[in-house]
């Protein structure tokens, strides 16, 4: 398949998924919340693409949720060439993707994160994943979450779940705290064996995330909570913030390559505490 066609169909999918996820979010919220939509460009001087991020805050369900779509192209700074697949031969790149971060009002509902992307240098590949970060322990929910992920992964390859779960556990870990960020999920990168099969898997990851977050929210949105629960949520958000600013590759890469700062930092919670 021609590379330009691959770029078109992947970016179209990510944009369509943004619309679908946003539709579900606003249907769940069903009240006046603060909504901000920002269309951004990577460069003010040149055509290097851009994207659109949407943020909903101060809602009935969501304290803050961000859904970002991007389609950008340009050249990597020299310091990145050694670390990015295919960039040594030529610094040019093209990338498109979607990222979602949800911070909930009810501390009984976990924070949730998802992203998928397609990147082209002299090589092309998919990456992404999803993970859940509860403030209040719920073993049953954890079991159901991983069962759903395993079922989805097994439809593509029986080895995917174990491999991508391990990758997620290793990635979403705070070394200075010696603790995981949450209950894990799946994480994958440099997926480039077969475009058609890999793209189908990436689409299923997005569809599964939409199913999972809506199911969890609808199940828990009316659960009662206390100030103690909220304090635990604020502390957990502090850990979330530490990870995103200290270790998250996407955050560091975006800030170091001139990405949209507000879009990059949309993952941060609206309020957090440290003890």
Predicted feature residues:
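A long amphipathic alpha-helix within ATP-dependent nucleotide-binding catalytic cores
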Residues: 92-94, 148, 152, 156, ...
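Gly/Pro-rich turn-and-neighbor structural signature
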Residues: 2-85, 191-246
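Glycine-rich, often proline-containing surface loops adjacent to acidic residues and nearby aromatics
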Residues: 94-96, 125-133, 179-193, 240-242
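A generic structural motif
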Residues: 6, 104-106, 122, 132-139, ...
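Long, contiguous binding/interaction regions
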Residues: 104, 251-275
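Compact, glycine/acidic-enriched structural inserts
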Residues: 122-166
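Long, charged, mostly alpha-helical binding arms that flank functional sites
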Residues: 152-201, 215-218
